[in-house]
Amino acid sequence: MENENLQPTEKKETTKEKKKLPKWANITITVGVCLTCCGAGVAAGIILSNFLSFNSTDYGALNIEDYEDDLDKLVTKYKKTDSHKYLSTFTPYELATIARYNVTQHTYVKSVGIGLVNAAMGVKQTVRSYYLKSDNQYFFESISKSKIVGVNKRFYQDETQVTIYTGRGSDPEKATWKEEDKTSVSIPEYEETWGRELSRCTNFIISSKTTLLDQSSATQDGNNIVLSLELDPLTSVLRYVKNMKAMSDLDDYPTFHKVHIDMTLDENLNVISTKTNEVYDVKSFGVTSKNTSGSLEETYTYDQKEDFPNLTTDCDYTKGE
């Protein structure tokens, strides 16, 4: 959601005591609405006039692996459980983890995300995300725009590397992509910088150690199961904050106040839809925006092959609305 090449212009000092400020007194803020089950974080930039103090969070003192559960053990239990007993056998976070695992088991997966960010000064920014899985290759597009700035990113992952394109244009649902506007990194390098590779089906850590059980639930709705997950705003975002910082070239990692995810699963524990809501503080260009809120709604389809868009092909977001 940001223009990474944006350089604020300066106005002349009117007095000796007055410091130089950017012409707009602005910052580019990462808005982190993220794909809950399949995707990379959808980060974006917002122009804000909001000078506030920033309390940074030392995520480096926390080890990601310490907050993740044993997936193999859970999957083994899941495969031995009768489908009519899912709700009584598994906790909300276990159901979410199984559903995310099931996403990875489909050869073809598609997720379309439609979101909105609300920030200080009444600034609003649209969010679009498009994710495709085709066997062991992955595509992800993130487009987010306000009236002033936006960010356009495409990611293509194969067996060995991730190729990242930075697009141009102001349209809220498409961009111009050029071959010269790309970088390629190995998958380990990408995961180190961005928090997770595209084959990992979420940026968030949803586990026994990151889920607030007294504020989470799983209920039956016809043949579906509806999950309401309140996550710890510190430990659940250890991967996610890397993505936000890399996407928007932030001064520091954002500090989260709230992470809530609603998920609807079918009777086979496939994800039908998700809605993510977040509140956080973020700092860029030395300026802080507090209590930025964002939401993203995603819909999922499976087992329908769709070719990855080339640089002249736009993603179709109409089916996600």
What residues fall within each predicted segment?
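Short, hydrophobic/aromatic-rich segments at coil-to-beta transitions
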Residues: 104-112, 137-139, 221-228, 246, ...
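Buried hydrophobic residues that stabilize the cores of well-folded domains
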Residues: 52-59, 154, 162-165, 271-276, ...
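Flexible, processing/modification-adjacent segments and terminal tails
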Residues: 163-224, 229-230, 234, 238
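N-terminal leader/targeting segments and the immediate start of mature chains
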Residues: 2, 6-128, 312-321
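An acidic-aromatic
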Residues: 123-195
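Gly/Pro-enriched, hydrophobic low-complexity segments
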Residues: 225-315
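Beta-turn initiation residues at beta-strand->coil junctions
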Residues: 113-118, 142-147, 165-168, 275-282
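Short amphipathic beta-strand and strand-loop transition segments with alternating hydrophobic
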Residues: 129-130, 208-220, 262, 303-306
